[in-house]
Amino acid sequence: MSAPLKRTPLAEEHLAAGACMVDFGGWDMPLAYGSQLEEHHAVRQDAGMFDVSHMLNVDVGGADATAFLRRLVANDVARLATPGKALYSCMLNPQGGIIDDLIIYYFAPDQWRVVVNAGTADKDIAWMQRVAAADGFDVVIAPRRDLAMVAVQGPNARAKVWAARPAWQAASEPLAPFSAAAVEAGTLVARTGYTGEDGFEIVLPADAVVQLWRDLLAQGVRPCGLGARDTLRLEAGMNLYGQDMDELVHPDQAGLSWTVALKDEARRFVGRDAIEQFAVPRAFVGLKLQERGVMRAHMPVRCAQGMGELTSGTMSPTLGVSVGFARMPVGVQPGDAVEVEIRGKWVPALVCKLPFVRHGKAVEHS
């Protein structure tokens, strides 16, 4: 018998709003509240909000916290020196495969926060504890399941958050992208997101999130589900763990080589040896379909260099055509013509540099 689905503190709000709920990594989450298309456009044109409380915030502290994170992840947290600054990184296994992709916030040398994906949270915590124990790091790894998280995204997102919480504006208005600030006790506002739009991700005590959700709703922020979240992240060229990469995929095979910091030879992060010995056999590219049809994950792609495969695909609400990501033979370049097999027919597609959409506008591809 399967375990019951986990629920976020906003579950009743979703049901009251008529959300279609689905199993997402063992969590009961909203797919859409009505029109997925309207939710997508709300984020691109105005403001939408997502319940992301299924994701786990993990506090990492202790005398060796910085050294531990420099060992744990492929990007180098030593580049973070300003409290509240963050970076994106992959956490690798010894073979160089991606255990998870994370955002890491710096507050002090002995005070960090790591945000991990919902479906990998238990695995991630176990791995973090294993690395800490193996190398004898003096660290405390504290999963914060007492916290909830709401992402408010779109060109008007920040203004609507401030309208709902005027006291937060002074601390959060100066934030640069990938920075966070405490706006009140126990509440962190970060200028981050997963949509390609401006906005905030707000981390706060679980018992305060329902009131925040209702106050944002009163300001005209539209609730959005996983369906819109997926089309938005695809347009923005952002990977989804478990679909575009996993433990068998190296960062270079997922377009994430920019997250691997190799400059400091003395920093032997987990997976570094495998990364340094690895000759990239695949390229990770964007595809835009040139005829009618919708690309989906696992569809074959053929090109002059050989065969590839789609990892993600959808119909882009902003562009009105199907877009996707594919792992292809090395040598495939933006502008190349390829073909995707859709229902037994080979349909032409254009290789594109990511993203497809930036700040609500189509990125030109020739």
From Swiss-Prot:
Catalytic reaction equation(s): N(6)-[(R)-S(8)-aminomethyldihydrolipoyl]-L-lysyl-[protein] + (6S)-5,6,7,8-tetrahydrofolate = N(6)-[(R)-dihydrolipoyl]-L-lysyl-[protein] + (6R)-5,10-methylene-5,6,7,8-tetrahydrofolate + NH4(+)
Molecular function in Gene Ontology: aminomethyltransferase activity; transaminase activity
Subunit structure: The glycine cleavage system is composed of four proteins: P, T, L and H.
Gene3D superfamilies recorded: Aminomethyltransferase beta-barrel domains (3.30.70.1400), Aminomethyltransferase fragment (4.10.1250.10), Probable tRNA modification gtpase trme, domain 1 (3.30.1360.120)
Entry GO terms, CC: cytosol; glycine cleavage complex
Purpose: The glycine cleavage system catalyzes the degradation of glycine.
Xref: Pfam families: GCV_T, GCV_T_C
Keywords, in A-Z order: Aminotransferase, Transferase
This protein's record includes keyword Transferase: yes
Listed EC numbers: 2.1.2.10
Keyword hit for Transferase: yes
GO biological process, one term: glycine decarboxylation via glycine cleavage system
Protein name as annotated: Aminomethyltransferase
Any coiled-coil regions, as ranges: none
Database matches in NCBIfam families: gcvT (TIGR00528), PRK00389.1 (NF001567)
Enzyme class of the recorded protein, top EC level: transferase
Family: Belongs to the GcvT family.
